[in-house]
């Protein structure tokens, strides 16, 4: 093999076999060349490429590195070396190597593009965006750079600019599928729903099996109040293996009181969770799946573990001896969480705590938003910030305890907490289950909703407050003007069972109980909160199938003022809770308005909030442990007016003294919990479960 002609011929054969995908044959020729010429540049480079194709990136890096020793200006080798570093997860080195490759003019654009992709992989979005700009400054016709720039801009919340970038790509290639698909996501961010549907059709005409686009189309149909079309698109996406589509198909059928396929959908959800498919954790909670399944769903949703980023450097406390608490939420707007938390925020002890608000949602102009903003010592809107930048801001502010009021719900930003926004991170109020995140240290709960024996199913350490964990606004007024039953569309005589829960909380087994109660109690009606007309129609049909006139189901319209909504509870006789997902704020509203609630305690956090609220309200006798007992108790209260009146009087007498409505007491317990968490952190102890002792 020392003859140059023989080496050249061997190289020719090696390249041909390599191009044909016959890697074993190509490898033999490369090896033979290197046996004769150990520093043969092309053989070193190509064998390195071959090793990378085989998945042996470490050996590929060694071989390509050897090739570069003999020709450091080889553009292909420089790019391959950088790309191999990226494959090995050595991103910082890869970026430096791409910079070297970019310095070789022959492939400057390609190297800069690869560098930008590496920055995307690292989550360094702003730098990636700048890198794509560099590529386009050299090659304005680089379609992939336009598309990737559009994707980055969409992720950064700059969807209008993203559309412009994607339209540039489509000017060069009108049928480019990736550009058309990316355009769907930008339009969806802008909530330009009609255009989203048009864009989806363009993609699906070229690629009818695009499950993600079917999923986006389904969500848009749902937003536009076209449930039949939405469910059909979710079905199509699920058939293509899109498990998040399964999640929403199941949830929205439940929302529409369509129970025809509940058993099959629940079985599919369980299979998906067991197979570690991406099932929305909230859906597992809504269907009352086992705590172990809720944990697995949450972990998978986050990516089979938290993927926590390295801890941020936390800012100095600027000489303050106050504990700095940051509440983080996408619900600082017209939302149940905002109404529940506001009284606690306003009452925090400012002599010992500095309270900071971090909003993940824009200002909706509501009165509660203004009140929320004013309740904080400092308030920051980070809607347009990246997760890393939001976490850095909190670190610079010296936040010691960060409280996640979302969990995996709409608008959540777990990436902020994954970047360790604070040394101590806590889940509270917004999500009645585990987040599944190893970067959330604690969950605030109570002994009823979350006994310590549930710790194996929670990634967070459980912290017990002495009473009901749920915060409430005890400054709310109940209108003194009680509307008549006739005004409310209710019969003037007869017993009124009431449940103002959202429709997805109404399960078939509970509805069975309700219909038996209506059959047993003469002239009784069931007063529900207004829901989608299909849900109302389906419930009417289900009632008729159980022998109950659908006209005995009466639906209350939305009340513009909270005080009027609370006041109309006086027209009802008894609130019936739901299972497996209890009423939470809704049940507490009923109790605040003076309406007794009957609940059945379930097997999950979400199914035990009613029990916790009733115990804290001093009415443990209204808590049952089975649907049979729940039905019997509701029936007895309806049949014995004196017994029901006794419960009503007891509720009224304790309204200002019971633990449920003592926000100062809750505040002292929550502050004690934060203090203990911080003391454990300062002492170097790992987070551990503990119980807060009662404080008067």
Spell out what each predicted region is.
Residues 328, 500-501, 529, 556:
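Short hydrophobic "strand-cap" motifs at the C-terminus of beta-strands
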Residues 578-580:
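A short structural motif in glycosyltransferase catalytic domains
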Residues 352-356, 515-544, 551:
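A conserved nucleotide-sugar
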Residues 323-327, 497, 526:
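Conserved hydrophobic helix-helix packing surfaces used for dimerization/oligomerization
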């Amino acid at each position: 093999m020392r003859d140059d002609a023989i080496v050249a011929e061997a190289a020719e054969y090696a390249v041909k076999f390599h191009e044909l995908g016959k890697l074993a044959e190509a490898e033999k020729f490369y090896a033979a060349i290197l046996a004769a010429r150990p520093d043969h540049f092309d053989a070193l480079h190509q064998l390195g490429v071959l090793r990378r194709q085989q998945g042996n990136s470490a050996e590929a890096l060694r071989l390509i590195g050897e090739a570069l020793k003999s020709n450091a200006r080889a553009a292909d080798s420089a790019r391959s070396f950088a790309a191999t570093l990226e494959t090995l997860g050595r991103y910082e080195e890869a970026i430096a190597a791409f910079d070297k490759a970019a310095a070789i003019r022959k492939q400057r654009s390609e190297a800069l593009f690869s560098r930008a992709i590496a920055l995307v992989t690292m989550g360094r979005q702003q730098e990636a965006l700048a890198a794509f700009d560099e590529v386009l400054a050299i090659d304005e016709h680089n379609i992939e750079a336009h598309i990737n720039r559009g994707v980055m801009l969409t992720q950064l919340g700059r969807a209008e600019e993203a559309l412009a970038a994607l339209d540039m790509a489509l000017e060069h290639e009108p049928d480019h599928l990736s550009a058309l698909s990316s355009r769907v996501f930008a339009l969806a961010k802008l909530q330009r729903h009609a255009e989203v549907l048009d864009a989806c059709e363009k993609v699906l005409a070229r690629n009818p099996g695009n499950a993600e686009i079917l999923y986006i189309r389904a969500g848009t149909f749902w937003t536009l109040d076209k449930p039949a079309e939405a469910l059909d698109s979710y079905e199509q996406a699920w058939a293509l293996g899109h498990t998040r589509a399964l999640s929403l198909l199941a949830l929205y059928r439940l929302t529409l009181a369509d129970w025809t396929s509940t058993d099959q959908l629940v079985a599919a959800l369980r299979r998906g969770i067991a197979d570690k498919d991406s099932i929305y954790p909230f859906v597992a909670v809504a269907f009352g799946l086992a705590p172990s399944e809720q944990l697995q769903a949450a972990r998978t949703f986050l990516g089979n573990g938290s993927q926590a980023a390295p801890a941020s450097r936390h800012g100095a406390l600027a000489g303050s001896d106050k504990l700095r608490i940051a509440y983080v939420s996408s619900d600082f707007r017209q939302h149940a969480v905002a109404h529940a938390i506001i009284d606690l925020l306003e009452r925090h002890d400012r002599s010992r705590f500095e309270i900071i608000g971090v909003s993940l949602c824009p200002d909706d102009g509501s009165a509660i938003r203004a009140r929320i903003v004013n309740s904080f010592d400092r308030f920051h809107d980070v809607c347009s910030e990246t997760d890393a930048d939001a976490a850095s801001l909190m670190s610079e502010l010296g936040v010691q305890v960060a409280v996640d009021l979302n969990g995996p719900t709409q608008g959540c930003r777990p990436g902020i907490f994954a970047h360790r926004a604070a040394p101590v991170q806590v889940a509270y109020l917004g999500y009645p289950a585990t987040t599944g995140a190893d970067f959330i240290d604690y969950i605030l709960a109570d002994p009823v909703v979350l006994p310590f024996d549930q710790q194996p199913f929670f990634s967070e350490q459980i912290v017990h407050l002495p009473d009901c964990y749920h915060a409430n606004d005890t400054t709310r007024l109940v209108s003194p003007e009680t509307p008549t039953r006739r005004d409310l569309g209710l019969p003037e005589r007869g017993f009124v069972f009431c449940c103002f829960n959202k429709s997805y909380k109404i399960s078939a087994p509970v509805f069975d109980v309700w219909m038996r109660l209506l059959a047993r109690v003469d002239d009784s009606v069931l007063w529900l909160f207004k829901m989608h007309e299909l849900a109302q129609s389906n419930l009417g049909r289900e009632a008729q199938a159980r022998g109950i006139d659908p006209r005995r189901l009466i639906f209350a319209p939305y009340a513009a003022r909270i005080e009027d909504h609370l006041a109309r509870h006086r027209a009802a006789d008894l609130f019936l809770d739901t299972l497996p997902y209890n009423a939470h704020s809704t049940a507490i509203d009923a109790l605040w308005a003076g309406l007794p609630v009957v609940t059945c305690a379930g097997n999950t956090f979400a199914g035990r909030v009613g029990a916790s609220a009733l115990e804290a309200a001093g009415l443990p006798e209204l808590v049952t442990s089975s649907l049979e007992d729940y039905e019997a108790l509701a029936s007895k209260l309806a049949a014995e007016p004196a017994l029901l009146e006794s419960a009503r009087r007891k509720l009224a007498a304790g309204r200002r003294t019971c633990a449920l409505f003592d926000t100062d007491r809750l505040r002292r317990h929550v502050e004690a919990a934060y203090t203990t968490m911080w003391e454990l952190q300062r002492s170097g102890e790992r987070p551990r479960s503990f119980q807060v002792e009662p404080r008067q």
